[in-house]
Amino acid sequence: MRTLWIVAVCLMGVEGHLTQFGDMINKKTGTFGLLSYVYYGCYCGLGGKGKPQDATDRCCFVHDCCYGTVNGCDPKLSTYSYSFQNGDIVCGDDDPCLRAVCECDRVAAICFGENMNTYDTKYMLHSLFDCMEESEKC
């Protein structure tokens, strides 16, 4: 519980994109958004290496790969526009870079929702020492 409190305090100052991504995750999973995924497995959170631990972690791996294809803005800092329409996430930017970032986040949030049955608390706050296998290519 103390660890979740520390993570929550660290995220309180987060503006823009991470807040938006967390909102998408919350809507698609009914969880606490980023708090549920920030240090999950080998790929959720900052960085990533090794082999994804399960389908949920693979969502983060694919998300990292998606960010790697974005050109023209910083995916982790860019603020984009989106809405929820009939339960679907709709990205609304005309700017191609912002739209691409939104699409990466949209696909990841949907992936989390579709793979909630693989979410395993043993991978929360997962040590990167357990992620030493050779990383897959995007």
Swiss-Prot record:
It is found in: Secreted. Disulfide bonds join 42-131, 44-60, 59-111, 65-138, 66-104, 73-97, 91-102. Expressed by the venom gland. Pfam families: Phospholip_A2_1 (PF00068). SUPFAM superfamilies: Phospholipase A2, PLA2. Residues 1-16 form the signal peptide. GO terms for cellular component: extracellular region. The keyword Calcium applies. Gene3D superfamilies: Phospholipase A2 domain. Binds 1 Ca(2+) ion. CDD domains: PLA2c. GO terms for molecular function: calcium ion binding; calcium-dependent phospholipase A2 activity; phospholipid binding; toxin activity. The active site is at 63, 105. Its cofactor is Ca(2+). It catalyses: a 1,2-diacyl-sn-glycero-3-phosphocholine + H2O = a 1-acyl-sn-glycero-3-phosphocholine + a fatty acid + H(+). Ca(2+) binds at residues 43, 45, 47, 64. Its EC number is 3.1.1.4. Its main location: secreted. It comes from the Eukaryota. PROSITE patterns: PA2_ASP (PS00119), PA2_HIS (PS00118). Belongs to the phospholipase A2 family. Group II subfamily. D49 sub-subfamily. Snake venom phospholipase A2 (PLA2) that is not toxic by itself, but the synergistical mixture of a basic and this acidic protein is lethal. PLA2 catalyzes the calcium-dependent hydrolysis of the 2-acyl groups in 3-sn-phosphoglycerides. Does not form a complex. This is Acidic phospholipase A2 VP7. It comes from Daboia palaestinae (Palestine viper).
